[in-house]
């Protein structure tokens, strides 16, 4: 089984061909392709990491763009009556891994 560890949006994801992965927003249109930098490649018993994995390219197709669940942030100060509520939704992209080369 061939899989790769890629860096996407400040995080690392384990992917193989055909996987659907949700990442932070990717600057590409729906249906467009994007390349993700590989940190490690595992092909059976062969493992490439570091400088050996620098030439490995992982390509993915953007399936859709969406927004994540709302996260509510509350600030509260005791005895003063101060409270503040703020919400945030992350911009996300779903991509399908099309190739590891």
Swiss-Prot record:
**Coiled-coil annotated residue ranges, if any:** none
Query: What's one GO-annotated cellular component?
Result: cytoplasm
Which terms does the record give in the GO molecular function aspect?
Answer: rRNA binding; structural constituent of ribosome
Q: Which domain of life is it from?
A: Bacteria
Q: How does it assemble?
A: Part of the 50S ribosomal subunit. Contacts protein L20.
**Homology family:** Belongs to the bacterial ribosomal protein bL21 family.
Q: What does this protein do?
A: This protein binds to 23S rRNA in the presence of protein L20.
Protein name from the UniProt record: Large ribosomal subunit protein bL21
Q: Which organism is it from?
A: Micrococcus luteus (strain ATCC 4698 / DSM 20030 / JCM 1464 / CCM 169 / CCUG 5858 / IAM 1056 / NBRC 3333 / NCIMB 9278 / NCTC 2665 / VKM Ac-2230)
């Amino acid at each position: 089984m061939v899989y790769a560890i890629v860096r996407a949006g400040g995080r690392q994801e384990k992917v193989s061909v055909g996987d659907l992965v949700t990442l932070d927003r990717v600057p590409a249109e729906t249906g467009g392709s994007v390349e993700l930098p590989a940190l490690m490649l595992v092909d059976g018993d062969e493992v490439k990491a570091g400088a050996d994995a620098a030439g490995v390219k992982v390509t993915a197709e953007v399936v859709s763009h969406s927004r994540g669940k709302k996260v509510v942030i509350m600030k509260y100060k005791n005895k003063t009556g101060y409270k503040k509520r703020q919400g945030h939704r992350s911009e996300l992209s779903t991509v399908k891994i099309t190739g590891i080369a």
